[in-house]
Amino acid sequence: MEFEKLQEIIAEVLNLEPYDITMEATFVDDLGADSLDIFQIIMGIEEAFDIEIPNDAAEQIVTVGDAAEQIKNALNE
């Protein structure tokens, strides 16, 4: 459930199909995101999941799986 919502957020920001977004995909190299795209994705995640991702944690997000892990951690706090 969380992964599908994450896929939708990323797909909307990057104009991709959700099924092209895998846990192993890197935002920059695989999905073609730039720093503004990543910022928009993080903002979308925070809004959709009603969480806050600290800046130091956001800087560690390289793959879609990293973002999913941050969501999981924030929801379990």
Where are these regions (language model features)?
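Residue-level recognition of oxygen-bearing side chains
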Residues: 1, 6, 26, 44, ...
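Thiotemplate assembly-line natural product biosynthesis machinery
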Residues: 1-19, 74-77
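Alpha-helical structural signal
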Residues: 7-10, 32, 38-39, 58
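Structural preference for long, well-ordered alpha-helical segments within the folded cores
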Residues: 9, 44-48, 70
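Phosphopantetheine carrier-protein modules
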Residues: 14-32, 48-57
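Short, structured secondary-structure boundary patches
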Residues: 25, 40-43, 59, 76-77
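Phosphopantetheine-attachment site and its flanking helix in carrier
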Residues: 29-47, 66
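C-terminal structural segments of small proteins and small subunits
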Residues: 52-54, 58-76
